[in-house]
C-alpha cells in the first residue's frame, strides 16, 4: 500500500470505511463476515498497515492521521457489529420459520388419572366414620402369626391358619414368630388397642390377602373393620352405628338391617349383618354386608384390658363388596383387569 502525505492517507482511510461497509454487506454468513473483518482489522489488515506507516509522517501529521485511523476503526467495528446482529437475526428468523407450529391442528388433551372405585369407597367410608368420632388405624401388611391369629382368639388348629387359606412369608419376626400376609385388618385394631386407653373407637381399612379367587373373591382385597371398646357398649350401639353408616354410604333411608346369629372366634355373641333396600332395583332382596359381634373376653384381655370392666363391638366389611353393591357391579374381577372403559365411568 503506497501513499504520499496525509491527504492521500485521509482519502485512503475514507475509502477503507466504504470498502468495509460493502464487504460486510456482501457477507452471507458468519464465516464470510469473519474473513471480511480480517481484511480490514486483522494483523495484516489495511488499517494495521496504515498505523505502521504513520512513522513516515511528521509529528503533526502523525497525530492528525492517528486520530483519523482510530475513528475509521471505530466506524468499521460498528459496521461489523451491525452486520453480525443482522445475520444472527436472519438465522433466528429462518429457524423459527422452519419450526413453525400449525395452530390449526386439533389439540391433544393430557390424559387425566382418576380415583379407582374401590379407593373411592375407602375414602367415603373413612369420611363417614370420622364424622361420628372414629379414628383411623394403620399397620403393616406383613404381620406376625400372634397379632393376626392368636390375639384374635383363633386356635392353633383353625383352618384359617393353613397354607391353603393364608399366604405365609418364609421369614420370622424378631421374636421368632412366623410372618404372613395379613388375612384381615383386625391386626391393626390389635396394635391400636394395645397402644391406646379406652374408650377406643377406631376403624381399620386396608389391603388383605387370602388364597382365594373368583367372581366374588380375589387373592388381594380390601376390608374395613371397626372397633368400639368402652364400659357400657351394647349390641344396640352396634346396630345404630352400622345402620346409620349404611344409610349414609348408600345415600338412602329406604333400607332395613337384620342381624343373623353366626360364629367368629373373636366375637361372642356373633352375627352376620344383612341389609335390604325397600325401593329400587334391589328391592326385597336381603344382601349379606358384614360380620359383627361383641368382642370376645379373651380378645379384650389380649388388648391388655379387663373384660370385667370393658366391653365393645366389632364389625368387618369388604370394601369391594360395598363398591359392587353401590355401583351395581356383579364381578369383582372387573375392578382389577385394568380396563379403562370400565374404570373411567366411575370418574365421569
Curated annotation (Swiss-Prot):
Query: What are the names of the required cofactors?
Result: Mg(2+)
- Molecular function (Gene Ontology), one example: magnesium ion binding
Query: Which cellular component terms (GO) are annotated to the entry?
Result: cytoplasm
Q: What is its EC number?
A: 6.1.1.20
Gene Ontology BP terms = phenylalanyl-tRNA aminoacylation
Which UniProt keywords are given for this protein, alphabetically ordered? Aminoacyl-tRNA synthetase, ATP-binding, Cytoplasm, Ligase, Magnesium, Metal-binding, Nucleotide-binding, Protein biosynthesis
Q: Name one Pfam family in it.
A: tRNA-synt_2d
Q: Which SUPFAM superfamilies match?
A: Class II aaRS and biotin synthetases, tRNA-binding arm
- How many and how are cofactors bound here? Binds 2 magnesium ions per tetramer.
Principal localization reads cytoplasm
Name by which UniProt lists this protein: Phenylalanine--tRNA ligase alpha subunit
Q: Name the gene for this chain.
A: pheS
